[in-house]
Amino acid sequence: MSGEETSADRNVEIWKIKKLIKSLEMARGNGTSMISLIIPPKDQISRVSKMLADEFGTASNIKSRVNRLSVLGAITSVQHRLKLYTKVPPNGLVIYCGTIVTEEGKEKKVNIDFEPFKPINTSLYLCDNKFHTEALTALLADDNKFGFIVMDGNGALFGTLQGNTREVLHKFTVDLPKKHGRGGQSALRFARLRMEKRHNYVRKVAEVATQLFITNDKPNIAGLILAGSADFKTELSQSDMFDPRLQSKVIKLVDVSYGGENGFNQAIELAAESLQNVKFIQEKKLIGRYFDEISQDTGKYCFGVEDTLRALELGSVETLICWENLDIQRYVLKNHANSTSTTVLHLTPEQEKDKSHFTDKESGVEMELIESQPLLEWLANNYKMFGATLEIITDKSQEGSQFVRGFGGIGGILRYKVDFQSMQLDELDNDGFDLDDY
């Protein structure tokens, strides 16, 4: 993934994978004709192709004719998918192929291949009556990457923690003069020299932090922990030299008894609880910002499907907020009474039961269904076209559940004020509605 992709884009990718895992886990097939294949980044396509050719030979000996044919068919499908790639993508490759049995009892072929959003270091080939998604689930478990700066009087260490993987990015030592009681008339001069050395040390730490933790003008970490003994970490967090983009990412200041690697390990232990709550805190902040716009009545907000989609089309949505379980379907219908027009509807499960939505009001002719998909899925695929960022939230925090219950689980923070009421009136006027008649 390129460094330009923001954490919001990454969250959308994660949501797509979660959705995919859910549908794959529910799928079941007859016999062992469902193939799960995961190829790690450094592997060779040629090795996997040879392994599949060997498997094809082995599968030809399966006694049950039906099972044999479906396994051979699945292996052939995987081979065709592999031919689309000249080499394994940077993050590895995941392929699921096979024949599943739908709820109606019909057989349906499934062919899925994609590159995960971060490197997958698992090699897997399995034929079974279900798809194996454990490796994908593990990929989602510990996604956020956190930065650590450990400072003490002897030097500084910069590291990252992602899941269970800790990495030291850089460290340097420093020789700071100690406090002392001698010096006579020079005592003030000594104190000033000491303060200057401290100041230069803090400045160097701030500069190195910017080099390591900022890529393409954006922080490449989800949060930052400042650790150390004495007062250095507080000095750094309040310093003007510390990059404001990183300042906003500081989650916690922790006191550690050591510097260097031991201090890094201690800081990870002490900050563990805060790191678990980061997603939760980010969500609270985002919805808090949305509620602030409403309470201050700035007009720079929208909620509900209609207003939000209208604002999206205007290009005025800066941040689009959606609940992860938004239960609204998007239908594209073709009207045969008026052959050129297509209608887009957004319906809840309750509204779907009312068949009048699918008939033309004037002619009473039933409209043809061209496509149907969950609205959130459509937004996840198209939000970039409207210049918005998409934030997918849960209802686990108090603010999240308030947003879902009170605002229907969809809304947005706008770049500028939009008057939705006058837009609705304009649309009615355009439909031949004359206010003078009333």
Swiss-Prot record:
<dbReference type="InterPro" id="IPR005142">
    <property type="entry name" value="eRF1_3"/>
</dbReference>
<dbReference type="InterPro" id="IPR029064">
    <property type="entry name" value="Ribosomal_eL30-like_sf"/>
</dbReference>
<comment type="function">
    <text>Directs the termination of nascent peptide synthesis (translation) in response to the termination codons UAA, UAG and UGA.</text>
</comment>
<dbReference type="GO" id="GO:0005829">
    <property type="term" value="C:cytosol"/>
</dbReference>
<keyword id="KW-0963">Cytoplasm</keyword>
<dbReference type="GO" id="GO:1990825">
    <property type="term" value="F:sequence-specific mRNA binding"/>
</dbReference>
<dbReference type="Pfam" id="PF03463">
    <property type="entry name" value="eRF1_1"/>
</dbReference>
<feature type="modified residue" description="Phosphoserine">
    <location>
        <position position="341"/>
    </location>
</feature>
<dbReference type="GO" id="GO:0018444">
    <property type="term" value="C:translation release factor complex"/>
</dbReference>
<dbReference type="InterPro" id="IPR005141">
    <property type="entry name" value="eRF1_2"/>
</dbReference>
<dbReference type="InterPro" id="IPR004403">
    <property type="entry name" value="Peptide_chain-rel_eRF1/aRF1"/>
</dbReference>
<dbReference type="GO" id="GO:0016149">
    <property type="term" value="F:translation release factor activity, codon specific"/>
</dbReference>
<dbReference type="GO" id="GO:0006415">
    <property type="term" value="P:translational termination"/>
</dbReference>
<dbReference type="Pfam" id="PF03464">
    <property type="entry name" value="eRF1_2"/>
</dbReference>
<keyword id="KW-0597">Phosphoprotein</keyword>
<keyword id="KW-0648">Protein biosynthesis</keyword>
<protein>
    <recommendedName>
        <fullName>Eukaryotic peptide chain release factor subunit 1</fullName>
    </recommendedName>
</protein>
<dbReference type="InterPro" id="IPR024049">
    <property type="entry name" value="eRF1_1_sf"/>
</dbReference>
<dbReference type="GO" id="GO:0002184">
    <property type="term" value="P:cytoplasmic translational termination"/>
</dbReference>
<comment type="similarity">
    <text>Belongs to the eukaryotic release factor 1 family.</text>
</comment>
<dbReference type="InterPro" id="IPR005140">
    <property type="entry name" value="eRF1_1_Pelota"/>
</dbReference>
<dbReference type="InterPro" id="IPR042226">
    <property type="entry name" value="eFR1_2_sf"/>
</dbReference>
<dbReference type="Pfam" id="PF03465">
    <property type="entry name" value="eRF1_3"/>
</dbReference>
<comment type="subunit">
    <text>Heterodimer of two subunits, one of which binds GTP.</text>
</comment>
